[in-house]
Amino acid sequence: MLKTTLLFVVTALAEIIGCFLPYLWLRKGGSIWLLLPAALSLALFAWLLTLHPTASGRVYAAYGGVYVAVALLWLYWVDGVKLSAYDWAGAAVALLGMAIIAMGWQRS
C-alpha cells in the first residue's frame, strides 16, 4: 500500500506541476517557455497512471483522494495559504476513501 501511495503522490505532483506552469504563463505573466516543461510533466503524469496496479477507473477513483491531499499541501507550501480545519478534514476523508478503494483491489 505504501508503494502505491508513493506512486500516487508522484503522479499528483506531475499533474499539478503540469497544470501550474501554464497557469503561471497565463495568469502571472510567465514565459511561454513554461509550456514545454508543463507538457513534459503532463506526459509523465499520463505515463505514471499506466504503472498503477489495477483497472484505470479504479486507479482514477483512488488517485483522486491522494490528489486532494497533495493539492492542499501545494496550496500551503507553494501558494502560502494557511490550511483550515475543513481542508484537513476534507483531505482525511479523501485519503480514507483512497485507502478503502486500494484495499479492495489488493484483495481481488
UniProtKB/Swiss-Prot annotation:
Q: Which UniProt keywords apply?
A: Cell inner membrane, Cell membrane, Membrane, Transmembrane, Transmembrane helix
Subcellular location field: Cell inner membrane
Pfam families (UniProt xref): UPF0060
**Keyword Membrane among record annotations:** yes
Q: Which InterPro entries match?
A: UPF0060
State the membrane topology. Answer: Multi-pass membrane protein
Parts of the chain that traverse the membrane: 6-26, 31-51, 61-81, 85-105
The record ties this protein, via PANTHER family, to: UPF0060 MEMBRANE PROTEIN YNFA
Q: Into which family does the record put it?
A: Belongs to the UPF0060 family.
User: HAMAP family under this entry?
Assistant: UPF0060 (MF_00010)
Q: What is this protein called?
A: UPF0060 membrane protein CJA_3703
| Source species | Cellvibrio japonicus (strain Ueda107)
